[in-house]
């Protein structure tokens, strides 16, 4: 049985980790931390978990208790894992970080986007970017895994087949993405209030979103060179979901794009390439660790449109983290993650 610790268990990604781990036959949560809710029972805060974690309480982070775990997940704001990851790694504990702390390979670039110096630059070289569809073999050997963000997951999975094949003009990529309100986190913010977010949609961070350098980094790896990406995120009046509409110029009209995508993801358990002409919906992935993709070439022209949908809290966060854990410990990748999406 894998002994699991969770740092920062009171947010949406933390409770989603708990929900998924409750169904995992090879993992047991030993420690869950929260400075603000120390002493509170998990089931008192999240009654949906009654019957699964009745004796588990939030506690103040204790590196000795966490270091006794086989793996520790960080479901925290950026900066927290910087302070604790090194000590846990020294104790022999694997670290899976759901925050942005180790996603970018360049410490200076991280500092520019997050407004503070990187707190553990020495760990960046060994941190493995946890997108299984790209880095599965590296994940198997990792000590420290950086779980991709939600927008980066949907965008990269949608564009990677075109870039790896050298078909798309990498200098003219567009990612037009929509997110549910849970992507903003559980903290109280005016923009997340029902009366503010309901029955409305808005673009934000057009000048530059923190996920932009992460997406660009992944697309550079796929293309083997520089990329030009315009990324525009939007807030939509739904709770869960990411819908990415991706645009790429592909001059070669002889390529069977449907076959290209199907071949690229043929052996990926959590990527579903839908039939030609499909329009995937966010509700089709709600609660499931899956990315559904459809590829279009409107009017047979040079512009290719890829539609990519995920649940931002599952394949975009906690589900992908658990997928990484399964790979890391040599388990079936699908363990604890095979449930269907919730409808309606």
UniProtKB/Swiss-Prot annotation:
One GO term describing the cellular component: cytoplasm
UniProt-annotated catalytic positions: 150
Keywords: Amino-acid biosynthesis, Arginine biosynthesis, Cytoplasm, NADP, Oxidoreductase
Endoplasmic reticulum found in the keyword field: no
GO MF annotation terms: N-acetyl-gamma-glutamyl-phosphate reductase activity; NAD binding; NADP+ binding
EC number(s) per entry: 1.2.1.38
SUPFAM superfamilies named among the record's database cross-references: Glyceraldehyde-3-phosphate dehydrogenase-like, C-terminal domain (SSF55347), NAD(P)-binding Rossmann-fold domains (SSF51735)
Coarse class of the protein's main subcellular location: cytoplasm
Gene Ontology biological-process annotations: L-arginine biosynthetic process
UniProt family annotation: Belongs to the NAGSA dehydrogenase family. Type 1 subfamily.
NCBIfam families linked: argC
Role of this protein: Catalyzes the NADPH-dependent reduction of N-acetyl-5-glutamyl phosphate to yield N-acetyl-L-glutamate 5-semialdehyde.
Protein name as it appears in the record: N-acetyl-gamma-glutamyl-phosphate reductase
Organism ancestry: Bacteria, Pseudomonadati, Pseudomonadota, Gammaproteobacteria, Pseudomonadales
């Amino acid at each position: 049985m894998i002994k699991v610790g969770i740092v920062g268990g009171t947010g949406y990604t933390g409770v989603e980790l708990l929900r998924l781990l409750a169904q995992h036959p090879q993992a047991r949560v030993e420690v869950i931390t929260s400075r603000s809710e120390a002493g509170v029972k998990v089931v008192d805060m999240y009654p949906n978990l009654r019957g699964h974690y009745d004796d588990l309480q939030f506690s103040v982070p204790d590196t000795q208790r966490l270091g006794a775990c086989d793996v520790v997940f960080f479901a925290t704001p950026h900066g927290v894992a910087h302070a604790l990851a090194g000590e846990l790694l020294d104790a022999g504990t694997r670290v899976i970080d759901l925050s942005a702390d180790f996603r970018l390979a360049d410490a200076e670039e991280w500092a520019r986007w997050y407004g503070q110096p990187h707190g553990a630059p020495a760990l960046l070289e060994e941190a493995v970017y946890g997108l299984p569809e790209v880095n599965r073999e590296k994940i198997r050997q990792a000590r420290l895994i950086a779980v991709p963000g939600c927008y980066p997951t949907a965008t990269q999975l949608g564009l990677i087949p075109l870039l790896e094949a050298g078909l798309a003009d990498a200098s003219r990529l567009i990612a037009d993405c929509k997110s549910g309100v849970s992507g903003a986190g559980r903290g109280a913010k005016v923009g997340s209030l029902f009366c503010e977010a309901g029955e409305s949609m808005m673009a934000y961070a057009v000048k530059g979103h923190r996920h932009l350098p992460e997406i660009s980094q992944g697309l550079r790896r796929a293309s083997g060179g520089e990329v030009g990406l315009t990324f525009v995120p939007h807030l939509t009046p739904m709770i869960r979901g990411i819908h990415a509409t991706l645009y790429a110029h592909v001059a070669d009209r002889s390529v069977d794009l449907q076959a290209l995508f199907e071949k690229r993801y043929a052996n990926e358990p959590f990527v579903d390439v839908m039939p030609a002409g499909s329009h995937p919906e966010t509700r089709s992935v709600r609660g499931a660790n899956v990315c559904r993709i459809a590829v279009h070439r409107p009017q047979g022209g040079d512009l290719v449109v890829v539609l990519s949908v995920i649940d931002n809290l599952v394949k975009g966060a906690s589900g992908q983290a658990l997928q990484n854990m399964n790979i890391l410990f040599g388990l079936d990748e699908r363990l604890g993650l095979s449930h269907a999406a919730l409808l309606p």
